[in-house]
A protein has these predicted regions:
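N-terminal carbohydrate-binding accessory modules
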Residues: 1-53
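A short, mixed-charge helix-start or loop-turn motif at secondary-structure junctions
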Residues: 26-30, 65-66, 112, 158
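Glycine-rich anion/phosphate-binding loops
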Residues: 31-42, 70-82, 114-129
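Active-site region of glycoside hydrolase catalytic domains
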Residues: 1-19, 81-85, 89-171
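Aromatic-lined substrate-binding rim segments of carbohydrate-active enzymes
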Residues: 45-102, 168
Length: 171
């Protein structure tokens, strides 16, 4: 897909805020409800288009799409594909965010972004999977939305914090 040319009025559709944290994510506790984008995305995208929005950043929820290593959740793959088709129908360019706030619990168990080996091995697989699933339907990518905020979870451990910042910069 080719992005539109010229200025754009854009918006953000955050996976965490729209859907709530995934049960398979690193966010502990009871999943919080989202804002109903799950079932009303077509209406929401139509409204955005009517308001003149021509581009959005849409967060991919890694923990929803890949709740276990090597396993893709087909229901979530289909849901994201439908959102992308809806955006295209409404003339909205989509830029996918590969990481916004949360990661799968299994990636967190491996050390998450504070572990160079886990990041170097598992992050590229996620990037390749996302590109394979959705690459032909998007205008561009945001690899890491907030690397400094992501690394802040290790602020209590200066070594891990530094490692996370480096690994996030490389990712």
């Amino acid at each position: 897909m080719t992005p539109s040319t010229g200025p754009a009025l854009g918006g953000v559709l955050s996976a965490l805020e729209a859907l709530g944290p995934a049960p398979a994510s690193d966010w502990p506790g009871t999943p919080l409800p989202g804002n109903d984008f799950l079932t009303r995305f077509d209406e929401d995208l139509a409204l955005l288009a009517d308001l003149g929005v021509s581009a959005v950043r849409l967060g991919l929820d890694w923990a929803r799409l890949q709740p276990a290593p090597g396993r893709v959740d087909d229901d979530w793959r289909e849901w994201y594909a439908n959102v992308l088709l809806s955006a295209q129908r409404h003339g909205i360019d989509v830029w996918l965010a590969l990481h916004e706030h949360t990661v799968p619990a299994w990636f967190d168990d491996e050390g998450s972004f504070a572990d160079g080996k886990a990041t170097g091995l598992l992050w590229p697989r996620w990037v390749e999977l996302a590109a394979e699933l959705f690459g032909d339907r998007v205008s561009g990518w945001f690899p890491i939305v907030d690397p400094v905020g992501t690394a802040a979870r290790w602020a209590h451990d200066p070594r891990k914090h530094e490692d996370a910042l480096v690994n996030l910069a490389v990712a």
